[in-house]
Amino acid sequence: GAHCVIANAVIGAGAVIHPFTHIDGESLGVTVGEAALVGPFARLRPGAHLGAEVHIGNFVEVKNSTLAKGAKANHLAYLGDATVGERVNYGAGSITANYDGANKHRTVIEDDVHVGSNCVLVAPISLGAGGTVGGGSTLTKDTPAGALTVARGRQVSIPNWNRPKKLPKA
């Protein structure tokens, strides 16, 4: 695509790199598999390895991660230090929280997992095959295969609530 930066990368046959995508493998390299779709406005950092038919959409960043065949992260997401299985759907706004302030940790997402929108996966963590993560969840523990995992507070509505008023300037 137009206005792309592509360096230190291997792009597979039939892969499409949409405009304004930034791919730079530096010393670790980047691999984009056959028939993969990347961008627009995606960023593939060193160690990003995309399998065949992977979709990395707009404003998705991938660093030091492997995505297996057919995995999708279509928009507004971060995958760092992750191993992602086949046919995973990674929801908009979801991130891997891979850095604890001192060390980097890995996230493993097994085959056929669906991660809802706006999830935080706090590494080290492993999501079992075929599982579903409810949107808005922050996960800190491994999840079993085939399970629906939801980790968020229940919605509460407070009737007749008044917003604080602005104080007059002194």
Residue ranges of each PLM-predicted region?
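Terminal amphipathic helices with adjacent charged low-complexity linkers/tails
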Residues: G1-F20, G39
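Glycine-rich hexapeptide-repeat left-handed beta-helix
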Residues: V16-A170
